[in-house]
Design a protein with these regions (language model features):
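A structural motif shared across PLP-dependent enzymes of the aminotransferase-like
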Residues: 96-111
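Residue-level recognition of beta-strand termini and adjacent short loop/turns
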Residues: 9-12, 26
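Extreme N-terminal starter segment of soluble prokaryotic enzymes
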Residues: 1-5
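Short loop/helix-cap segments at secondary-structure boundaries that form the rim of catalytic
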Residues: 90-91, 105-109, 182-187
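Mid-domain Rossmann-like dinucleotide-binding core that forms the NAD(H)/NADP(H) cofactor-binding site
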Residues: 119-195
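Glycine-rich beta-strand-centered segment in the early N-terminal region that forms part
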Residues: 23-39, 47-100
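Glycine/charged-rich beta-loop-alpha catalytic/anionic-binding loops adjacent to active sites
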Residues: 110-121
Length: 202
């Protein structure tokens, strides 16, 4: 069977590669068909432009990366798909995997997150960002009465602020130099503060 993957041949030079993929049914691996593949705007922009320094190559490596940051490289880690081959109990299950941009791939079942629930599964493209938000929460070790300011309303910033809100933190503020993003804070019930007034937060 054929599979197609996105590679960066050189700086900002993406290409599509075709490959013949073989799969023999077994109890340990499954075949996943990609439904949605997300691009990390920050990380993958750095990778595509060749701006990963050599001392960061090992740290920045994604789990199923092929090639190197010196190019060519197949990179990515936000994949929402469906199991199309494998043990019967997993068939047709929706999945999230830390896999690059590829139409069809085989993977060890231990590296697959089975998605539960109904609704629009595109929301699971934010899974990697949500993990980062939770790690931020753990690393800060904040107390409920602490005053917290989150700078930047990208996906990670918004998810981090919202996670604090879910955990009943009352003094959480978020800001961004783009004042138009205030409307998103309002929708989520987050406390937006004008970037120019940060000094007055205390």
């Amino acid at each position: 069977m054929e599979t197609y993957s996105l590679w960066l041949k050189n700086e900002n030079k993406p290409i599509i590669k075709k490959k013949i993929l073989s799969y023999k049914k077994n109890s340990k691996t499954v075949l996943v068909k990609t439904l949605y593949s997300g691009i990390s705007k920050g990380t993958e922009r750095l990778v595509a432009s060749g701006n990963i320094s050599k001392d960061q190559f090992d740290i920045m490596k994604s789990p199923f990366q092929e090639g190197s940051f010196s190019f060519p490289i197949k990179y990515g880690y936000i994949n929402v798909g469906k199991i199309v081959e494998g043990p019967k109990k997993y068939l047709n299950k929706n999945t999230f995997c830390l896999y690059p941009h590829q139409s069809l791939f085989k993977i060890d079942i231990n590296n697959v997150n089975i998605l539960k629930g109904n609704g629009d599964i595109r929301k699971y493209l934010l899974t990697a960002n949500m993990e980062t938000a939770i790690n931020i929460f753990w690393d800060t070790q904040a107390k409920l009465n602490n005053k917290i300011l989150i700078i930047g309303m990208g996906s990670v910033g918004i998810l981090t602020a919202y996670y604090y809100k879910l955990l009943k933190f009352k003094n959480v503020f978020i800001t961004d130099i783009n004042i138009k993003k205030k409307k998103f804070a309002n929708i989520l019930g987050l406390k937006f503060i004008n970037f120019k007034k940060i000094k007055n937060l205390d």
